[in-house]
Amino acid sequence: MEELLEILNDIKDELNGNVKLVFQPAEEGIGGALPMIEDGILENPHVDAAFALHVEPLEKTGNIQIKDGSIMASPDDFKIVVHGVGGHASAPEKCVNPVTIGTAIITEFEKLNATVLKDKPCVMTVCYFNGGTCNNAIPQTAEIMGTARSLDNETREMLIELLDKTAHETAKKHG
């Protein structure tokens, strides 16, 4: 970015208009572009055109990709806590195993990826699953965490609703 600043400074007399270089902090957390836009980053002076840059570690060094419209998806992290009835592994009939329910939820999510979501501008990935701390006790809870990413608000809302509905319906089926 420093090199770009130097180049732009060298040709500033040839430029028609103003140039703003904006750095987007914490784009995958509470930061990102929206709070900056709401705070007026695109005004004073007004921005007529914007170009974005995002590092792509899988792209060969020296190559760039150019695309009109959205190219990087917005992330929505999710965490699901499955509540069961814990107990000793010798008496599973007295328990509701949250690990079993959690694996069923993850399986249903993968089915969504392969069917409903396969042609949509989104992706949903389970990245964490944890239930229990030993090999002879059924735990009280299990946790599932992941990320749902989408390129537009309509798809984002559909994806969040679908994940919530699928998790609740699957849990209900299993006790």
Please annotate each region the language model reported.
Residues 97-100, 158, 162:
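A general alpha-helical scaffold signature found inside nucleotide-binding enzyme cores
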Residues 140, 174-175:
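Flexible hinge/switch segments at interdomain interfaces of large molecular machines
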